[in-house]
Amino acid sequence: MTLRIAIGGFLHESHSFAPCPTTYADFVQPGGFPGLCRGSAMLPAVRGCANAVAGAIAVAEAAGAALVPLAWCIANPAGPVEDAAFERIAALICAELSAALEAGPLDGVYLDLHGAALIVGAIPVTASLDPHANLTLQMVEESDALAPYLTYPHVDMKDAGARAMRLLLDRVARGVPFAKAFRQGAFWIPITSQCTLVDPMAAVMTERAAILARTGAAELAWCFAFPYADFPGCGPALAAYAGTQEAADAAADALLATVHSREGDFQLDVVPAAEAVAAAIREAGPGGPTVI
Protein backbone atom coordinates (compact mmCIF):
# COMPACT_ATOMS: atom_id res chain seq x y z
CA MET A 1 0.00 0.00 0.00
CA THR A 2 1.33 3.43 -0.94
CA LEU A 3 1.23 5.87 1.97
CA ARG A 4 -0.30 9.27 1.23
CA ILE A 5 1.43 11.93 3.33
CA ALA A 6 0.70 15.66 3.38
CA ILE A 7 3.73 17.91 3.74
CA GLY A 8 4.06 21.63 4.48
CA GLY A 9 5.80 24.21 6.62
CA PHE A 10 5.50 27.60 8.31
CA LEU A 11 8.66 28.93 9.99
CA HIS A 12 9.48 32.10 11.89
CA GLU A 13 11.59 33.08 14.90
CA SER A 14 9.80 36.00 16.56
CA HIS A 15 11.53 38.48 18.87
CA SER A 16 8.93 40.11 21.11
CA PHE A 17 11.07 43.22 21.61
CA ALA A 18 12.15 43.81 17.99
CA PRO A 19 10.65 47.05 16.61
CA CYS A 20 9.68 45.79 13.14
CA PRO A 21 6.79 43.32 12.81
CA THR A 22 6.95 40.47 10.31
CA THR A 23 4.51 40.92 7.42
CA TYR A 24 3.02 38.64 4.79
CA ALA A 25 5.44 40.13 2.25
CA ASP A 26 8.35 38.90 4.37
CA PHE A 27 7.19 35.32 3.78
CA VAL A 28 6.60 35.89 0.07
CA GLN A 29 10.14 37.23 -0.42
CA PRO A 30 12.22 36.12 2.58
CA GLY A 31 15.67 36.60 1.07
CA GLY A 32 18.05 33.64 1.16
CA PHE A 33 15.21 31.08 1.22
CA PRO A 34 12.50 29.96 -1.19
CA GLY A 35 9.49 32.26 -1.10
CA LEU A 36 6.01 31.17 -0.04
CA CYS A 37 4.97 28.28 -2.27
CA ARG A 38 1.94 26.03 -2.35
CA GLY A 39 0.42 23.07 -4.14
CA SER A 40 2.26 21.68 -7.13
CA ALA A 41 4.86 24.47 -6.99
CA MET A 42 6.00 23.56 -3.49
CA LEU A 43 8.07 20.40 -3.91
CA PRO A 44 10.25 21.72 -6.78
CA ALA A 45 10.83 24.95 -4.84
CA VAL A 46 12.06 23.34 -1.61
CA ARG A 47 13.53 20.02 -2.73
CA GLY A 48 17.08 21.34 -3.09
CA CYS A 49 17.17 23.70 -0.10
CA ALA A 50 18.97 23.11 3.19
CA ASN A 51 15.82 23.25 5.31
CA ALA A 52 14.27 20.33 7.15
CA VAL A 53 11.53 19.89 4.57
CA ALA A 54 14.10 18.73 1.99
CA GLY A 55 15.30 15.95 4.29
CA ALA A 56 11.72 14.87 4.93
CA ILE A 57 11.00 14.73 1.19
CA ALA A 58 14.04 12.52 0.57
CA VAL A 59 13.07 10.00 3.27
CA ALA A 60 9.40 9.87 2.21
CA GLU A 61 10.21 9.36 -1.45
CA ALA A 62 12.80 6.69 -0.63
CA ALA A 63 10.05 4.87 1.30
CA GLY A 64 7.74 5.05 -1.72
CA ALA A 65 5.26 7.44 -0.12
CA ALA A 66 3.05 9.70 -2.22
CA LEU A 67 3.60 13.27 -1.04
CA VAL A 68 0.72 15.75 -1.04
CA PRO A 69 2.20 19.28 -0.91
CA LEU A 70 0.31 21.85 1.15
CA ALA A 71 2.26 25.11 1.45
CA TRP A 72 5.67 26.11 2.81
CA CYS A 73 7.08 29.46 3.85
CA ILE A 74 9.73 31.07 6.00
CA ALA A 75 10.60 34.62 7.02
CA ASN A 76 13.84 35.83 8.54
CA PRO A 77 13.93 36.47 12.32
CA ALA A 78 12.27 39.77 13.25
CA GLY A 79 9.41 41.09 15.34
CA PRO A 80 6.21 39.12 15.94
CA VAL A 81 4.23 38.05 12.89
CA GLU A 82 1.34 40.39 12.15
CA ASP A 83 -2.01 38.78 12.95
CA ALA A 84 -3.25 39.28 9.39
CA ALA A 85 -0.18 37.55 7.97
CA PHE A 86 -0.45 34.61 10.36
CA GLU A 87 -4.15 34.11 9.70
CA ARG A 88 -3.66 34.37 5.94
CA ILE A 89 -0.89 31.77 5.83
CA ALA A 90 -2.59 29.45 8.32
CA ALA A 91 -5.79 29.63 6.27
CA LEU A 92 -3.84 28.85 3.12
CA ILE A 93 -2.28 25.73 4.68
CA CYS A 94 -5.64 24.62 6.08
CA ALA A 95 -7.30 25.12 2.69
CA GLU A 96 -4.69 22.94 1.00
CA LEU A 97 -5.12 20.33 3.73
CA SER A 98 -8.90 20.34 3.31
CA ALA A 99 -8.48 19.86 -0.43
CA ALA A 100 -6.07 16.99 0.19
CA LEU A 101 -8.56 15.30 2.50
CA GLU A 102 -11.37 15.74 -0.01
CA ALA A 103 -9.20 14.01 -2.62
CA GLY A 104 -8.71 10.99 -0.38
CA PRO A 105 -7.61 9.80 3.07
CA LEU A 106 -4.22 10.81 4.41
CA ASP A 107 -1.94 8.42 6.29
CA GLY A 108 0.04 11.19 7.95
CA VAL A 109 1.10 14.83 8.01
CA TYR A 110 4.65 16.19 8.22
CA LEU A 111 5.23 19.86 9.08
CA ASP A 112 8.44 21.87 8.90
CA LEU A 113 8.00 24.31 11.79
CA HIS A 114 10.05 26.63 13.90
CA GLY A 115 8.05 26.14 17.05
CA ALA A 116 4.30 25.72 16.59
CA ALA A 117 1.90 22.84 16.01
CA LEU A 118 -1.11 22.24 13.80
CA ILE A 119 -4.05 20.12 14.91
CA VAL A 120 -5.20 17.60 12.31
CA GLY A 121 -7.53 15.35 14.29
CA ALA A 122 -6.78 11.63 14.29
CA ILE A 123 -4.25 11.71 11.44
CA PRO A 124 -0.68 11.10 12.69
CA VAL A 125 1.35 14.33 12.72
CA THR A 126 5.08 14.81 13.17
CA ALA A 127 7.12 17.98 12.79
CA SER A 128 10.70 19.12 12.71
CA LEU A 129 11.52 22.10 14.92
CA ASP A 130 14.23 24.65 15.38
CA PRO A 131 15.65 23.98 18.89
CA HIS A 132 14.88 27.62 19.66
CA ALA A 133 11.24 26.60 19.69
CA ASN A 134 9.50 27.31 22.95
CA LEU A 135 8.16 23.79 23.32
CA THR A 136 4.88 23.56 25.24
CA LEU A 137 2.78 20.74 26.62
CA GLN A 138 0.03 21.59 24.13
CA MET A 139 2.44 21.17 21.21
CA VAL A 140 3.44 17.73 22.50
CA GLU A 141 -0.15 16.68 23.16
CA GLU A 142 -1.37 17.74 19.72
CA SER A 143 1.32 16.00 17.67
CA ASP A 144 2.66 12.45 17.48
CA ALA A 145 6.37 13.30 17.58
CA LEU A 146 8.64 16.33 17.28
CA ALA A 147 12.25 16.33 16.07
CA PRO A 148 14.32 19.48 16.71
CA TYR A 149 17.63 20.19 15.01
CA LEU A 150 20.56 18.96 17.11
CA THR A 151 22.96 21.79 16.31
CA TYR A 152 23.36 25.50 16.95
CA PRO A 153 24.56 27.02 14.67
CA HIS A 154 22.01 24.99 12.69
CA VAL A 155 23.77 22.71 10.20
CA ASP A 156 21.50 19.64 10.43
CA MET A 157 18.12 21.00 9.37
CA LYS A 158 17.70 18.42 6.60
CA ASP A 159 18.68 15.65 9.04
CA ALA A 160 15.96 16.81 11.45
CA GLY A 161 13.39 16.70 8.67
CA ALA A 162 14.52 13.18 7.84
CA ARG A 163 14.19 12.15 11.50
CA ALA A 164 10.69 13.60 11.71
CA MET A 165 9.62 11.81 8.54
CA ARG A 166 11.05 8.49 9.79
CA LEU A 167 9.10 8.98 13.02
CA LEU A 168 5.95 9.56 10.97
CA LEU A 169 6.50 6.43 8.88
CA ASP A 170 7.19 4.45 12.06
CA ARG A 171 4.06 5.86 13.72
CA VAL A 172 1.92 4.88 10.73
CA ALA A 173 3.43 1.39 10.63
CA ARG A 174 2.90 0.92 14.39
CA GLY A 175 -0.75 1.86 14.19
CA VAL A 176 -0.65 3.24 17.74
CA PRO A 177 0.83 6.47 19.15
CA PHE A 178 4.19 6.66 20.88
CA ALA A 179 4.17 7.05 24.64
CA LYS A 180 5.16 10.65 25.46
CA ALA A 181 6.77 12.47 28.36
CA PHE A 182 7.06 16.27 28.56
CA ARG A 183 9.37 18.12 30.93
CA GLN A 184 9.87 21.88 31.39
CA GLY A 185 13.22 23.33 32.42
CA ALA A 186 13.53 25.42 35.57
CA PHE A 187 15.60 28.28 34.09
CA TRP A 188 16.16 30.17 30.85
CA ILE A 189 19.31 29.60 28.80
CA PRO A 190 20.84 32.69 27.13
CA ILE A 191 21.35 32.41 23.37
CA THR A 192 25.08 32.96 23.95
CA SER A 193 25.22 29.75 26.01
CA GLN A 194 23.34 27.56 23.54
CA CYS A 195 26.12 26.78 21.04
CA THR A 196 26.37 22.99 20.64
CA LEU A 197 30.03 23.15 19.57
CA VAL A 198 31.24 23.86 23.11
CA ASP A 199 30.29 22.98 26.66
CA PRO A 200 27.97 23.06 28.45
CA MET A 201 25.54 22.45 25.57
CA ALA A 202 27.94 20.11 23.76
CA ALA A 203 28.03 17.91 26.87
CA VAL A 204 24.22 17.98 27.12
CA MET A 205 23.89 16.87 23.49
CA THR A 206 26.39 14.05 24.04
CA GLU A 207 24.39 12.87 27.03
CA ARG A 208 21.17 13.12 25.03
CA ALA A 209 22.56 10.60 22.54
CA ALA A 210 23.65 8.32 25.38
CA ILE A 211 20.20 8.47 26.98
CA LEU A 212 18.55 7.55 23.68
CA ALA A 213 20.81 4.53 23.33
CA ARG A 214 20.34 3.50 26.95
CA THR A 215 16.54 3.81 27.12
CA GLY A 216 15.66 2.77 23.58
CA ALA A 217 13.47 5.85 23.15
CA ALA A 218 12.45 6.69 19.60
CA GLU A 219 13.21 10.41 19.96
CA LEU A 220 14.32 12.85 22.64
CA ALA A 221 13.26 16.31 21.54
CA TRP A 222 15.33 18.92 23.38
CA CYS A 223 14.50 22.59 22.74
CA PHE A 224 16.81 25.22 24.22
CA ALA A 225 14.03 27.83 23.68
CA PHE A 226 14.12 31.43 22.53
CA PRO A 227 14.01 33.63 25.64
CA TYR A 228 13.18 36.74 23.61
CA ALA A 229 9.72 35.43 22.70
CA ASP A 230 7.73 36.88 25.56
CA PHE A 231 4.82 34.57 26.41
CA PRO A 232 3.89 32.29 29.35
CA GLY A 233 5.24 29.08 27.76
CA CYS A 234 8.67 30.51 27.05
CA GLY A 235 11.57 28.39 28.29
CA PRO A 236 13.65 25.26 27.69
CA ALA A 237 11.69 22.03 27.49
CA LEU A 238 11.93 18.50 26.19
CA ALA A 239 9.74 15.63 25.08
CA ALA A 240 10.58 11.93 24.96
CA TYR A 241 8.85 9.44 22.67
CA ALA A 242 9.08 5.69 23.21
CA GLY A 243 7.28 2.38 22.93
CA THR A 244 6.35 2.41 26.61
CA GLN A 245 5.53 5.16 29.10
CA GLU A 246 8.25 3.86 31.39
CA ALA A 247 10.91 4.33 28.71
CA ALA A 248 9.61 7.79 27.77
CA ASP A 249 9.59 8.94 31.41
CA ALA A 250 13.07 7.52 32.02
CA ALA A 251 14.53 9.32 29.00
CA ALA A 252 12.84 12.62 29.82
CA ASP A 253 13.83 12.55 33.49
CA ALA A 254 17.44 11.69 32.66
CA LEU A 255 17.89 14.54 30.18
CA LEU A 256 16.16 17.05 32.45
CA ALA A 257 18.48 16.05 35.30
CA THR A 258 21.47 16.53 33.00
CA VAL A 259 20.34 20.04 32.03
CA HIS A 260 19.59 21.06 35.61
CA SER A 261 22.97 19.77 36.81
CA ARG A 262 24.63 22.22 34.40
CA GLU A 263 22.64 25.30 35.41
CA GLY A 264 25.64 27.27 36.65
CA ASP A 265 27.65 26.45 33.53
CA PHE A 266 25.08 28.16 31.29
CA GLN A 267 25.77 31.54 32.93
CA LEU A 268 28.30 33.27 30.69
CA ASP A 269 30.21 36.42 31.54
CA VAL A 270 29.67 38.81 28.65
CA VAL A 271 31.53 42.03 27.86
CA PRO A 272 29.59 45.30 27.50
CA ALA A 273 29.46 46.56 23.91
CA ALA A 274 31.77 49.56 24.43
CA GLU A 275 34.40 47.41 26.13
CA ALA A 276 34.15 44.77 23.40
CA VAL A 277 34.71 47.35 20.63
CA ALA A 278 37.67 48.88 22.45
CA ALA A 279 39.23 45.46 23.05
CA ALA A 280 38.77 44.48 19.40
CA ILE A 281 40.45 47.67 18.20
CA ARG A 282 43.39 47.06 20.53
CA GLU A 283 43.64 43.44 19.42
CA ALA A 284 43.61 44.38 15.72
CA GLY A 285 46.43 46.91 16.11
CA PRO A 286 47.02 50.02 14.02
CA GLY A 287 47.05 48.09 10.73
CA GLY A 288 43.56 46.66 11.21
CA PRO A 289 41.11 45.54 10.11
CA THR A 290 38.99 45.31 13.24
CA VAL A 291 36.62 42.35 13.17
CA ILE A 292 33.91 41.86 15.80
PLM feature segments, named:
Residues 55-59, 92, 138, 163-170, ...:
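Alpha-helical scaffold segments in soluble metabolic enzymes
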Residues 53, 57-98:
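Low-complexity, highly charged intrinsically disordered N-terminal segments
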Residues 3-5, 192-292:
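Hard-cation-handling environments
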Residues 2-62:
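N-terminal amphipathic/basic leader segments beginning at the initiator methionine
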Residues 6-13, 81-176:
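Active-site histidine-anchored catalytic micro-motif
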Residues 56, 60, 92-102, 135-137, ...:
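Structured alpha-helical segments in the cores of large, soluble enzyme domains
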Residues 161, 165, 169-213:
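Conserved anion/nucleotide-ligand pocket segment
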Residues 2, 65-68, 108-116, 120-127, ...:
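Hydrophobic alpha/beta core scaffold segments
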